[in-house]
């Protein structure tokens, strides 16, 4: 691409590509896409975006195309890679002038220089760093800033490289420029502090921006640039200097008010100082040891004493608390139980910590956390009134403690209390004792203090296990507080019910549950929505608890379910509806079939909620979870839900529909439990199986559930299902088998085994295409025992229950292996006998014995040759399935099932599903459970004897080991 002639053409097309008119925009984008691989295109783009007279939008687009080009074509091995000559020209052009006037474009240029540096620096671009170092020294403000901006992005990018060779290069770079970076930062910081006192706002902002950028560079060099940073005097000097600088900047915040244009940048710089300390502590805990004392003194004084008044702000307090927390919790500072096993560095750090956290310091921190930071703020109380649902779902999970004040204070309290519980337990107990009895509803401050102390007692529940008689406290103090219905008392009603939820799994007597359920029923009718939502949460914790007893809960079930349902209707926010649905699901799951009389209202409401939640996939996930538990609770009655249930399953498991990304896992689970609880198949239930084929193609972690669903259909309606879907299913399995893991192969073949078990006539025909590979696996001696076991189970089913099909399969395989049928059968029996040890389940061992015995009686010489092996297998199976009656000394087959056997269901066990009943009916027709192995062997041997005569039979029996014969005779006593 000739630069001079091409520039105007490219400029014109870029201008068209900034158009709002798609008729102009689309062809321009297409043309630019074609030019991406043209030599010289990126040189033209460089000329365009460095020409400050051109339109800003056009230059912006040129930078973006250049940046994408680096990602796609800069590497030498990339298809259509840029030539080394062009890259060399581009590198030189990028760092010729640092004079971009537009901030956004300057940032993009800095980022793309960093991208090139990641690939080429220092080997192909040794001049980059020296050029940047010189450029940040110039007097021109704009050039200096742009060079510093680029310096930061390059440092950040090089610091992020993780390969050992790249790390080594970055260490070399850091040690080479660290002194310069420190002096640069000090210079800009001093300049800023001078400007602050002069009152020149523009100069203050400009110097502060440079201070921030130079500090960002230092952060990356300090944290990522040294293997043992504590051995470098400059690094440790910089880190120690941070505390003094922080004090200076915090003092500046007194003079720079909240409405000042510099305020935001100032706070960012203060936070960046703390990030340097936090990152350094995270990456180099041992190197941080000399900084522990100073960090703790600094953080504690600003957060827990009057030193911080008037200068601290929320994000800074959070960072200081995180610094304290990371020092308290750091494993590198915790000695082993046996002190001698700990490193000197660990012992030194531990000593510094112990010297700092004295009794007075810990007591003051604990008291300040509870009486100051735990108090509900004016802002929170206003939110409670104006947006109760927003108040209840305030972010408290995951990493919120790193950024938000309330979760941060609570996590710090938990960690300090855990670490120093012997010191702090008496302090908290004393706080509790001062708050005994009811609190005056007119004294809002006293109510908030009590709320804060109760919060601490809840958070420290595990630590206070031995120190608080919670059952007594519940009866004498907490229960009466829940009964105070005054509106101003609602913070305490909410806090007390929350507190009980925290203690439920720690220490709460089972006998007190009914009293708690009574209280929950009352609070679910509280006038305040926040109290009702908190009560629902505690109900979930109570029902979820290990010691939950259904019999205690049942008297309150109807009331609670009705009130929870009302709450579900009352709340409007998606998150709150999800939360209440989870509580309902939990209740349904625990009481199971007992829920049936009370679910009518919920069943009617869920379709409406599903419709309303079209845009809220996470809420739909919660609805799916609720439906799963509902179907399990309703059992066969869940058929009445099909008009709503089946379209929901259809949508959730349709991979062509966008929502499946969120809904698939729960949708498959719902599909499975629907099948398990279905009393009979319906055309609609059969129809949604059309979704299965694409799901099998996905080969995702959901395959196991998919196989369970297929089995569910086979048990539910084998003939109809197999006639409709077996051909497609067989094709999917055929394609899937070579691609999947051993475990996956077993799952596929279990489906085939079930089809053969349920429908011995139709099954083999339907899966005809898969059976040769099973046969092949047996003949060739499949090496994985679990796979061989399932191969033999499938073969056993065909041989035992569909002999004619087995003969045709044997014939087909004879042609493939170029062997006579008898010879091939002999090889199969030999391998079967040899690999019988691969079968671990007694049912399958018995199946193998029955299958091979079914070849008898026979005058076929091959089968007679293998007679010894068949008897060996049969006796092995007898050992596994026969139990001896100690009184009569006779044996009976423990696999046999009778029509009248009803399994006893204990109170803790779930009642059998419809699928369990179908499996029981199937077992009653299965030879494994209906044919006595003892009798079968006896009859087969008798028939063989009749064919061969006494002498011939005796000769045959002599081929069997005498010990085996003795065992066989013992088992056959009485026949």
Curated annotation (Swiss-Prot):
InterPro entries referenced in this protein's UniProt entry, alphabetically: ARM-like, ARM-type_fold, Importin-beta_N
GO cellular component: cytosol; nucleoplasm
Residue list for modification N-acetylmethionine: 1
BP GO terms, sorted: ribosomal protein import into nucleus
Pfam families referenced in this protein's UniProt entry, alphabetically: IBN_N
HEAT repeats: 123-160, 283-317, 318-356, 422-459, 473-509, 511-548, 555-593, 600-636, 640-677, 683-720, 731-773, 819-849, 850-887, 957-974
Subcellular location: Cytoplasm; Nucleus
SUPFAM superfamilies from the UniProt entry: ARM repeat (SSF48371)
Importin N-terminal domain residues: 28-100
Function, in words: Functions in nuclear protein import as nuclear transport receptor. Serves as receptor for nuclear localization signals (NLS) in cargo substrates. Is thought to mediate docking of the importin/substrate complex to the nuclear pore complex (NPC) through binding to nucleoporin and the complex is subsequently translocated through the pore by an energy requiring, Ran-dependent mechanism. At the nucleoplasmic side of the NPC, Ran binds to the importin, the importin/substrate complex dissociates and importin is re-exported from the nucleus to the cytoplasm where GTP hydrolysis releases Ran.
Name of the protein described by the UniProt record: Importin-11
